Structure formats: structure tokens, C-alpha cells
Amino acid sequence: LKEIQVPDIQVVNSEKEIGRDWETQYRNWATPKGALALLVALQSQRKLSRESQTLLLKLMTESIPGAKRLKGELPAGTVVAHKTGTGGIRNGITSATNDIGIITLPDGRHIILAVYINDSLSDGSTREHVIADIAKAVCTRWTTGQLPDVSEYQSGVPGKITK
């Protein structure tokens, strides 16, 4: 990651190790800035062969998990190369529901987006809907210039998302 100039990402433990202990999952981390830098490196083919870039983008575009996240509220046919992340649940708190991706707009421009929801009390459907709404709002802003209304979301209980 340092070689391709991607800051703010640390990978220490395997998925198997993470599954054994709740606290271990927090040793692997990526800030939104780091995730975006990684996607920029992928998009710009930094230190990556054309074949590897093509394969990674194909796998990310055809990914089935997370269809209700970044892709969820976008127009049918919108190309989204993305990678989800989902953490464990303990005492009703989900440690992470994330999606990062490269969204291709109808005019060929790209939006690189990272949405992280962490330590949430909200159910999975709500968390995924929030990610989808954020992606839709960003795409609406970039394609129409209009700021979408997001006033329906409230913050009353820490970790709980309500509409």
C-alpha cells in the first residue's frame, strides 16, 4: 500500500483471526481517505497491470453482496465497481456496514465514494438504505447540480439511524 501511495490503511489480521475475537476486527482499518486513495490507484492503474486492473474492476462490478448499498437507489444500468465490508454484531451493535466504489455516470465521468457506518444499533436494512441514499444524493448532485433533501434523517439516539 505504501508503494502505491495509499495512506491510512492497516491490514494486520486475517478474516479467520478476526472471527475469533471481537476486538481483533478493529486492528484492521481503513479511513475513508485511505479507501478513496486505494480506489484512485485502481482507477488510474497505479503499479497494476492492465489485465489485473480489468480483472479487479470486473470482479467488483459483478459483485453480488451489497446490491442494496451503493447500487441500491441508482438508476438501473449504472455501473458500480464496489467492495463491501460488514463487521460482526455484539449486544445489538453492528461494528461496520461499509461500501466503497467507483460509480460510472451516464456521461462517462466517475465518482469514487466511500460510505462507512460503524457501531450502529440500526438494523441491516436501514444501514444499507442509508448507504444507498448517500450514493443517490452524491450522484444526483453530480448529474443535476441539485442538492437532494436529506432532512428525513434524524439523530436522536447515538448509533441509531431513524427516518
What are these regions (language model features)?
Residues 36-79, 84-163:
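Structured C-terminal helix/loop/strand segments within mature extracytoplasmic catalytic/sensor domains
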Residues 1-47:
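Mid-domain, small-residue-enriched loop/turn segments at the edges of structured enzyme/sensor domains
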